[in-house]
Curated annotation (Swiss-Prot):
Keywords: Ribonucleoprotein, Ribosomal protein, RNA-binding, rRNA-binding. It comes from Blochmanniella floridana. NCBIfam families: rplB_bact. Residues 224-265 are annotated as: Disordered. This is Large ribosomal subunit protein uL2. One of its GO terms (molecular function) is rRNA binding. The gene is rplB. The keyword rRNA-binding applies. One of its GO terms (cellular component) is cytosol. Part of the 50S ribosomal subunit. Forms a bridge to the 30S subunit in the 70S ribosome. One of the primary rRNA binding proteins. Required for association of the 30S and 50S subunits to form the 70S ribosome, for tRNA binding and peptide bond formation. It has been suggested to have peptidyltransferase activity; this is somewhat controversial. Makes several contacts with the 16S rRNA in the 70S ribosome. Signal peptide: none annotated.
Length: 276
């Protein structure tokens, strides 16, 4: 993959930084693994038509690719048929073909190439793309697509360039270190995939213009100080100073206030994530 900075032939090209990956498949996605529902069809509205998620709307139509996060087809080898772009996530995806002819999409790990063989199971080799329980993975290994509940499918480390490291074992639990700095316990029966997620240069891209955000369904974000008092607690007044602690449009503190409400699973978090 190469990073290309565009020439300033126009104001919209001046700040664009693109990622070019010549190994991605140029054709249409595998139709049997596409969801019937359009991925971005709600536009941030609920069934009453009211905005439930701000700054979302319009954007190009996106078909959702059904990704196999469970990797529960054990002891059957699969071959990587092709690598594809997925508009619904920062990571690329890989189309794999099992020996019996079944095809599935998986997250494309780093250093996984077309033609490589991968397998899932209880005791499989430790190589990128293979999936197995945490209890059978050596301490210190780099993994991704980690389950938090047995059989539910991977939930941790699914974005481009992310990974989780196994720190130690504690009886029936495995202690993991996340990229955020959080250290937490997960059941040893939970599965994970070896390696880190690919496309780690994703963070280097720059959209370069407002229209590129609109193509992705991202609408403008207006500052609260630029609004009227009826629209935002920061609105109104003379000058730019709003004279209070920063809050959301609904009056909730917006800098530093903890929003985690699931106290039931606090016992699994040994160390909270680092402050940015």
């Amino acid at each position: 993959m190469s990073v290309i900075k565009c020439n300033p032939t126009s104001p919209g090209r001046r700040h664009v930084v693109k990622l070019v990956n010549g190994g991605l498949y140029k054709g249409k996605p595998y139709s049997s693994l596409l969801s019937k529902k359009v991925a971005n069809s709600s536009k941030g509205r609920n069934n009453y038509g009211r905005i439930t998620m701000r700054h979302i709307g319009s954007g190009h139509k996106q078909r959702y690719r059904i990704i196999d996060f469970k990797r529960n087809k054990d002891d059957v080898f699969a071959v990587v048929e092709r690598m594809e772009y997925d508009p619904n996530r920062s990571a690329n995806i890989a189309l794999i073909v099992y020996k019996d002819g079944e095809r599935r999409y998986i997250l494309a790990p780093r250093n996984l190439n077309v033609g490589n063989k991968i397998i899932s199971g209880l005791n499989v080799p430790i190589s990128p793309g293979n999936s197995l329980p945490l209890s059978n993975i050596p301490v210190g290994s780099i993994i991704h697509n980690v389950e938090m509940k047995v059989g539910k499918g991977g939930q941790l480390a699914r974005s481009a360039g992310t990974y989780v490291q196994i720190v130690s074992r504690d009886g029936e639990y495995i202690i993991l270190r996340l990229r955020s700095g959080e250290i937490r316990k997960v059941r040893c029966e939970c599965r994970a995939t070896i390696g880190e997620v690919g496309n780690n240069e994703h963070m280097l891209r720059a959209l370069g213009k407002a229209g590129a955000s609109r193509w992705r369904g991202i609408r403008p974000t207006v500052r609260g100080t630029a609004m009227n008092p009826i629209d935002h607690p920061h609105g109104g007044g003379e000058g730019k100073n709003f004279g209070k602690h920063p809050v959301s449009p609904w009056g909730v503190q917006t800098k530093g206030k903890r929003t985690r409400s699931n106290k039931r699973t606090d016992k699994f978090i040994l160390c909270r994530r680092k402050k940015k």
